[in-house]
């Protein structure tokens, strides 16, 4: 379950990059405490996870979610089947899928803030931020249809929660067409860290 109020089935950048950041933070804390074996374990998991995400989730423009439905609903305890996307995990609705998520690099943003360095290949991070501006930015909201909550109107510009430049799932996650300032902030700060000043300040 995640901050989009949905269950994502399969590896996705938002949770994956948070995980990489947690591994790096745990490594640093373990080294400080003299727990070198645990630090090495965290580093090994981080390096393997980083390589896997860059190789498997980066599509050349941004990181995307690989939807992996369960083969059998009984693989998850019934008490954990809550919220959107939980009705039938063998055919889950409300998934991100191939969308360009506004805060897919939120873990990278926090890693920079905490001095933990890059969690992914820097060239991929920079390209992803450019893609977020390319696909998610709306200069105004006049022609934008949103069947959910509206937090920007008229001539206000904003970054959509997600865009679908190639294909969209039949039932994407519910908030994809909304805009939310906090999520925009993580993308903007990420752009500033990468020297994309004009985009970040926009």
Give residue spans per PLM region.
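Extended glycan-interaction surfaces of carbohydrate-active proteins
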Residues: 1-10, 54-180, 202
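Conserved positions within tetratricopeptide repeat
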Residues: 40-43, 47, 126, 198-201
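Well-ordered alpha-helical scaffold segments within catalytic/enzyme domains
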Residues: 18-36, 103, 107-120, 185-196
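Hydrophobic, small-residue-rich alpha-helical packing segments that form membrane-like cores
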Residues: 1-58, 68-72
């Amino acid at each position: 379950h995640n901050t989009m109020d949905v269950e994502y089935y399969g590896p996705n950048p938002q949770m994956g990059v948070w995980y990489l950041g947690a591994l790096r933070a745990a490594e640093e804390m373990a080294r400080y405490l003299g727990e070198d074996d645990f630090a090495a374990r965290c580093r090994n998991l981080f390096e393997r996870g980083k390589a896997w995400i860059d190789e498997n989730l980066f599509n050349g423009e941004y990181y995307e979610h690989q939807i992996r439905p369960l083969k059998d609903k009984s693989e998850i305890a019934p008490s954990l089947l809550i919220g959107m996307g939980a009705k039938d995990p063998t055919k889950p609705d409300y998934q991100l899928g191939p969308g360009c998520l506004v805060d897919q690099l939120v873990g990278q943003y926090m890693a920079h803030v905490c001095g933990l360095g890059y969690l992914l290949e820097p060239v991929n991070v920079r390209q992803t931020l450019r893609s977020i501006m390319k696909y998610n930015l709306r200069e105004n909201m006049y022609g934008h249809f949103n069947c959910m909550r509206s937090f920007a109107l008229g001539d206000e510009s904003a970054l959509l929660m997600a865009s679908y430049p190639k294909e969209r799932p039949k039932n994407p996650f519910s908030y994809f067409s909304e805009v939310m300032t906090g999520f925009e902030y993580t993308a903007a700060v990420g752009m500033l860290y990468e020297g994309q000043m004009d985009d970040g300040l926009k």
